[in-house]
């Protein structure tokens, strides 16, 4: 359970000064091996993408950067407390947590046939809360269809922030509906959320949703 993972080790209070650069900030976390680390079922990787100042002619995703891969609860809390809160980032920044070995791109073999559930956030505080609840659910293997999930993306925007939960097999409606219902429960959302296929999004920017819960 995600709650068990969260409770396993209290969030560490770090004295290291935050650095404005993402990689430097991750290093500032000063993660140290500890006695009796609480290992996760699988490794996870944080990614960062700032699209606020794209270079002319740059391909989509060219600013995507791998930030840190972790495999223990202790590492997770160090990283989250020190760096990885969406509200800390400027507009047009995308923040990702994906299974290690999977890149947050449509072209990745694990994502190519997938899609995403999307939810919008009414405030920065709400975004941070939903983000943290989702992270704990993922690393805590709280979803019955955990192997179907690639990761989650927090998109910080000027007008409206959003979270997107990426999955592997969009055509597997039963699995996607189960994931969608569970996610709504985890982030405590009552409004309808929608699921779109990556293939549809490639062809059409405002692709019509295929599923909703």
From Swiss-Prot:
Signal peptide: none
Principal subcellular localisation of the protein: cytoplasm
Subunit structure as annotated in this protein's UniProt entry: EIF4F is a multi-subunit complex, the composition of which varies with external and internal environmental conditions. It is composed of at least EIF4A, EIF4E and EIF4G. EIF4E is also known to interact with other partners. In higher plants two isoforms of EIF4F have been identified, named isoform EIF4F and isoform EIF(iso)4F. Isoform EIF4F has subunits p220 and p26, whereas isoform EIF(iso)4F has subunits p82 and p28.
Expression tissues: Mostly expressed in leaves, flower buds, leaf buds and anthers, to a lower extent in roots, stems and green immature fruit, and, at low levels, in petals.
GO biological process: defense response to virus; regulation of translation
Region (Disordered): 1-37
Pfam families named in the record: IF4E
Family indicated by similarity: Belongs to the eukaryotic initiation factor 4E family.
Record's protein name: Eukaryotic translation initiation factor isoform 4E
Keywords: Cytoplasm, Disulfide bond, Host-virus interaction, Initiation factor, Nucleus, Plant defense, Protein biosynthesis, RNA-binding, Translation regulation
